[in-house]
Amino acid sequence: MPAIGQTQDAPKLKIATNQGDILIELYPDKAPKTVANFLQYVKDKHYDGTIFHRVIPNFMIQGGGYDAQYKERSMRAPIQHEGRQAMTAGLKNQTGYLAMARTNDPHSATAQFFINTVDNAFLDPTPIPDGDPVKRFEYRGQVYENVPRENLLNALQLFGYTVFGKVTAGMDVVNKIRTTPTGMGGPFRTDVPKTPITILSITLVQ
């Protein structure tokens, strides 16, 4: 049994791509549902043969949802957003960290993930001050006073993106991917690698 205060073992995985291997570790103690969801997709071999379909050099690389013909893979039900608890535990959208992609609905993440290629603090959940109502809250230059706490907790723009792991080796591969030429592809008008960047497999190594 782990000692008191010791975190759970961080699962280590290898993302094998046609550009090289990326090693990652995940943090089930900080984002348990997110990590369990990702590991289930790995076990199901969902990611094998998918592509990084969205590559923006000074932002992130995103994949895990489409094959090389831009056909969307079937996915399970979305998971609960865990961004706030993950950030409280120290995880942020910094260079080399993995986060779940989603729609405007914070609780819509399924299989797609992204790797931050720069520090993206604006993707982090917005901290909400103590109190109910919250006496003073500032957001993007606007100051709000005496706001019911529930309103802030449910404000879609404050959720951010759930970070659940980081790259431990292979950032050279990530950087190679992020600088690949992009353009149109399938249903996407921009940011698609002109030469497909394929995830051959994601496997547990520990």
Which residues fall in each region the model found?
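Cyclophilin-like peptidyl-prolyl cis-trans isomerases
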Residues: 1-206
